[in-house]
């Protein structure tokens, strides 16, 4: 839930039609890239026409290949952002300003310490903050089940 809350943003929380503001073409609850949807036999238009509940089935399908490899919140987010980092240490560099300048630039907002290296921990920090905020009153249901 924290990953979807982060990916859809504060103004469109859990909206399945939200599109990436940077123009990547990504859409939906986990910001599916057009190429990812194509590999799943779907189109951006089909994903955009889904309700949140319908898109959750697509999210489940997307995560299926990773199901036994996700052991932390960071790993779950890496399945969305950079699957090659699943299972790697939190200190692992995802992108560097020198090594992958374009990818670094596209994600430079995740470089918390501004050192030109985006680590797995840095990339997941905003998702973790979203999770922690979501665990605060008034978001936590404490009524009868």
Language-model features: where?
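A recognition module on extended beta-rich or small alphabeta surfaces enriched in W/G with H and D/E
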Residues: 117, 121-123, 127
